[in-house]
């Protein structure tokens, strides 16, 4: 496997060379499809995955010192390419910042590692404030993107914590994810499923996935007994007592008659999205009834 990966990646590097310092047109520009492999998610996902790939293959006899040099040189180019070509906004920018921060945390041998961590963590802190509205709803109004955004923001912070580098993140970083976590709790049906509001892909958010995320939220906020209750499938923690919740910034209004597996729920969607952006659909007034 290691030899095959080295052969494939070596060929890829020769086929798609990157000249250091190259910048590309802004996202959505008319030349955006040129050099696509060096833009946006493509580079960020390579950086994140290559950290895992290196640790997986480095014990192989085929992972020679010569190849290590090639790999690390290419890795540094990838990170610096991201830094020169950040998106202005959106989930792709979050992944770019995540990749740069992860590189700084997990590849401390690089001379720019501290810069990578500082820059990446700062951008993640800025994006938490921009991507979650005042009531905690993600600005794309898509439940699956909402859950994914919490995960992206937290995973990078968690890796920093495990490596004693969380101090590089802005003050109050983790606490800003508490309202978003509670929104997931409030909009989840009694059978641990969610509705297909906007572009939500509810089939990807089944019971096991939601419980896994609630356990992650319980790890983030160990003193929050309501989240613990959701994470434990109602076996421990404290049952919420409120029966209605209005997310007035995000435009989700939730009613229920109780908090057990026999509960009835109604959710009304009335998102404030005047520019028809991203993953929100123009169907305000849609409601769902769970019984």
Residue ranges and their predicted role:
Residues 133, 137-291:
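Carbohydrate-active enzyme catalytic cores, enriched for enzymes
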Residues 1-178:
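Aromatic-lined, polymer-binding surfaces characteristic
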């Amino acid at each position: 496997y290691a030899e095959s990966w080295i052969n494939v990646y070596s060929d890829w590097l020769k086929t798609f060379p990157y000249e250091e310092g190259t910048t590309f047109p802004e996202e959505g520009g008319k030349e955006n499809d040129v050099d696509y492999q060096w833009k946006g998610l493509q580079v960020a996902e390579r950086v994140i995955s290559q950290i895992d790939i290196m640790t997986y293959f480095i014990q192989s006899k085929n992972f020679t010192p010569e190849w290590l040099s090639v790999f690390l040189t290419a890795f540094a180019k990838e990170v610096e390419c991201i830094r020169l070509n950040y998106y202005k906004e959106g989930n792709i920018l979050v992944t770019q910042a995540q990749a740069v921060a992860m590189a700084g945390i997990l590849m401390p041998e690089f001379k720019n590692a501290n810069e990578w961590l500082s820059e990446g963590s700062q951008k993640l802190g800025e994006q938490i404030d921009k991507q979650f509205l005042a009531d905690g709803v993600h600005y794309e109004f898509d439940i699956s993107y909402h859950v994914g955004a919490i995960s992206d923001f937290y995973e990078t912070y968690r890796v920093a914590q495990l490596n004693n580098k969380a101090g590089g993140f802005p003050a109050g970083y983790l606490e800003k994810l508490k309202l978003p976590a509670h929104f997931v709790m409030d909009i989840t049906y009694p059978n641990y499923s969610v509705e297909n509001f906007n572009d939500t892909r509810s089939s990807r958010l089944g019971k096991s996935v939601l419980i896994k995320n609630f356990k992650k939220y319980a790890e983030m906020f160990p003193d929050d007994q309501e989240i613990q209750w959701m994470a434990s499938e109602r076996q421990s923690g404290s049952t919420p007592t409120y029966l209605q919740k209005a997310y007035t910034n995000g435009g989700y209004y939730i009613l229920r008659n109780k908090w057990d597996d026999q509960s009835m729920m109604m959710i009304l969607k009335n998102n404030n999205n005047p520019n028809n952006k991203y993953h929100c659909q123009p169907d305000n007034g849609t409601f769902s009834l769970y019984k």
